[in-house]
């Protein structure tokens, strides 16, 4: 069983992953779920939180992790992804990959015979968003009809937030400049899931005030990701500032609204120091929760093994 996006999860699957995450957070050590199992951790781009949290997760579950960076593995260069996937499947029990192109993940999953986990791709960031959900849940907020407003670039995080929100019956607002909307395939999938469950909603807007009004959660991410080579910095500086999460925007939300950012943050750009360091900010709890969620994800993909 792979974890490439969230849209293959049923609501009960997502709830079980969050339930297991809470258990692992309360009981961090002493597990042997991954005893005698080897987990490949592939990184095509630099990583701090993802690498540390997955490496620790594997080891704290009793497994062995093997980290390979871009210059240490022939991923479509000198060797086809097909052959790499087939060979790695002979050695390891799970492949965790942070890749530049989502197609790389799909090929690893198609040609390999072991579960593949998306640690980040250009289209989707499921493990991050599961950690976001855990952060929301542990702060006592009910997902059903919760209003989550995302501000900035319609990127991989916003894509995954739409899917997660649809599955759990949330009201998701994605506020982006025009031409920076989230991926159309993910929008379509989210709307299909909303129709399936008959709960929740998805609103795309270029008005951050509308999105922030009475919001339970305000969320942002960097305006320019590491993989964004086509964005003009001056254009971003001109178009994006009104989507910054600052005290003025936060004042439109509910008084007990929480603020999330998946980090790393460009302080003073997408979010101010005042907000990210405030009591309403849960970004460092959110970062820690990557560890606990990823343990639950590893357990989930191996449940039929």
UniProtKB/Swiss-Prot annotation:
Its main location: cytoplasm. L-ornithine binds at residues 156, 221, 225-226. The keyword Nucleotidyltransferase does not apply. Coiled coil: none annotated. It comes from Methanococcus vannielii (strain ATCC 35089 / DSM 1224 / JCM 13029 / OCM 148 / SB). It is an enzyme of class 2 (transferase). This is Ornithine carbamoyltransferase. GO terms for cellular component: cytoplasm. Its EC number is 2.1.3.3. One of its GO terms (biological process) is arginine biosynthetic process via ornithine. Keywords: Amino-acid biosynthesis, Arginine biosynthesis, Cytoplasm, Transferase. It is found in: Cytoplasm. Reversibly catalyzes the transfer of the carbamoyl group from carbamoyl phosphate (CP) to the N(epsilon) atom of ornithine (ORN) to produce L-citrulline. It catalyses: carbamoyl phosphate + L-ornithine = L-citrulline + phosphate + H(+). GO terms for molecular function: amino acid binding; ornithine carbamoyltransferase activity. Belongs to the aspartate/ornithine carbamoyltransferase superfamily. OTCase family. Carbamoyl phosphate binds at residues 47-50, 98, 125-128, 262-263, 290.
């Amino acid at each position: 069983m792979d974890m490439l996006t969230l849209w293959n999860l049923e609501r009960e699957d997502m709830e079980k992953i969050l339930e297991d995450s809470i258990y692992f957070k309360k009981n961090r050590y002493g597990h042997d779920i991954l005893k005698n199992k080897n987990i490949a951790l592939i990184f095509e781009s630099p990583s701090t939180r993802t690498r540390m949290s997955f490496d620790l997760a594997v080891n704290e579950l009793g497994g062995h992790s093997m980290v390979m960076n871009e210059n240490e593995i022939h991923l479509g260069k000198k060797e086809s992804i097909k052959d790499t996937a087939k060979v790695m499947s002979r050695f390891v029990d799970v492949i965790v990959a942070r890749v530049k192109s989502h197609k790389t993940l799909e090929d690893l999953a198609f040609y390999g015979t072991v579960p593949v986990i998306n640690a980040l791709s250009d289209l989707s960031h499921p493990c991050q968003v599961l950690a976001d959900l855990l952060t929301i849940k542990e702060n006592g907020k009910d997902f059903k009809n919760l209003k989550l407003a995302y501000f900035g670039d319609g990127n991989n995080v916003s894509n995954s937030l739409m899917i997660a929100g649809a599955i759990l019956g949330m009201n998701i607002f994605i506020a982006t400049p025009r031409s920076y909307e989230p991926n159309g395939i993910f929008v379509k999938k989210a709307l299909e899931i909303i129709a399936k469950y008959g709960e929740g909603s998805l609103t795309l807007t270029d008005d951050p005030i509308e999105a922030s009004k009475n919001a339970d959660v305000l969320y942002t991410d960097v305006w320019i990701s590491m993989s964004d080579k086509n964005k003009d910095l001056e254009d971003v500086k001109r178009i994006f500032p009104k989507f910054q999460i600052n005290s003025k925007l936060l004042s439109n939300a509910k008084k007990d609204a929480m603020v999330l950012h998946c980090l790393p943050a460009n302080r003073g750009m997408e979010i101010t120091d005042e907000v990210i360091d405030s009591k309403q900010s849960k970004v460092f709890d959110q970062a820690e929760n990557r560890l606990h969620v990823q343990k639950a994800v590893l357990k989930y993909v191996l449940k039929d093994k």
